[in-house]
Amino acid sequence: MAHDRIIFPMPASCEVVFDVFHYHHWRARWDSLVSHTELDGGAPCPSVGAVSASTGGGLLRALSMRTEFVSYQRPRLAAARMVGTSFPFSRWAASMKHERAAGGGSLLIYTYNIEAGPRLLRWLIEPVVHHVFRRQTVKRFARMHAFLSAHAAEVEAWQRAYHGARCGDPL
């Protein structure tokens, strides 16, 4: 099983970064790793126990995954695990922790565990899968950083107008 923890400095508050990832109408504007994400039941953002279906983007369009949220504590922590399997993953789990950064902005701490399958080929494919997953994760959060650099004020204005009745704590 491959495990990693990557820290990404972000140019916005924990609240803004959390919402830009978990509210799908924001995420669709920057996340080219995923072409489509939808929560069972159509909610605009997750909650504990919510299941999402995601389809890969770009060269990874053939990949799809269903995940269940095991933690959702806006704006500090979200964690999910894969439901079932989705080649090349036999197991996948990740968490995103958000902390305020000294001097402004925040830190997004992304931790993941992945296991590649099938089991008989794990020794061969898991190092490759881990390398590609890590590289795509770094690119993905660099795109989020660029989006936040240009649009954090727009997200903050939306947060002030949105009552949050459907997704956790009011803003």
Question: Where are the predicted features?
Answer:
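Short, solvent-exposed coil/turn segments
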Residues: 1-3, 32, 47-49, 62, ...
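Short, hydrophobic/aromatic-rich segments at coil-to-beta transitions
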Residues: 45-53, 72-81, 153
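Conserved short hydrophobic interaction patches
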Residues: 23-24, 72, 143, 147
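Amphipathic alpha-helical interaction elements
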Residues: 19-22, 57, 129, 133
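Terminal "cap-and-tail" regions of soluble proteins that handle hydrophobic small molecules
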Residues: 3, 7-11, 61, 97-171
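Hydrophobic-ligand binding "helix-grip"
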Residues: 28-29, 58-109, 113-115, 170-171
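Hydrophobic ligand-binding cavity/cleft-lining segments
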Residues: 1-44, 167-171
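Anionic, Ser/Thr-rich low-complexity intrinsically disordered regions
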Residues: 5-6, 36-40, 56, 79-82, ...
